[in-house]
Curated annotation (Swiss-Prot):
The gene is pstB2. This is Phosphate import ATP-binding protein PstB 2. It is found in: Cell membrane. It comes from Ligilactobacillus salivarius (strain UCC118) (Lactobacillus salivarius). GO terms for cellular component: plasma membrane. Part of the ABC transporter complex PstSACB involved in phosphate import. Responsible for energy coupling to the transport system.
Amino acid sequence: MEKIITTKDVHLYYGSKEALKGITLDFPDKGIHALIGPSGCGKSTYLRTLNRMNDMIENVKIEGEFKFKNQNIYDEKIDLVELRKKIGMVFQQPNPFPFSIYDNVTYGLRMAGIKDKRILDEKVETSLKQAAIWEEVKDNLNKNALALSGGQQQRICIARVLAVAPEVILLDEPTSALDPISTEKIEEMLLTLRDNYTCIMVTHNMQQASRISDTTSFFLSGNLVESNKTKKIFLNPDKEQTADYLSGKFG
């Protein structure tokens, strides 16, 4: 199966503290890929290396090989804006911009110089439909996105990412701040995206990982313990540490 992102021997240091200890992990094109492990294990830190979000943190040193479709993600000449369009990010806390739903979804398109209202209108409708929120907001696109519920705000943020045509969507615990109904809506929406996008999701919710992901990778203390098809990880893991974590012995 074709790999869209490959990482090899990844080390990351916060000052002198080593947070990632030689991670080698690849992601096949399309599907949902879960990163699991206890708090502080390095899964979110690793996720943020994939579109260079850790560049914003002072005193961070990153080593290893990172490739997106055989392009070096850490090439000095790479256009970070373009990279983050292709590898979008959805955060734990919904973070819509403080303006209308319409302007939130079209923000990236406008920044790219697209001004044709017909194109913008089409992108708004398509992206909101993909994010499973069109029916809830279609008659109120001028409403301030901050006035929406947390679950709706998160889906607006996902629509904003989708509008700029990413190939990979990184999701850092996208439902942990949401109620069960909102969580279910986002899970259902992600399942509809899996055939067209590569979704890489950090989650503390074991049931969520087992329900919707195709592959699962288990992190512990900055190490990658194992990675495999989700069914294999949950039913017959190779490593005792994985079995112990999934059975609730620690974490």
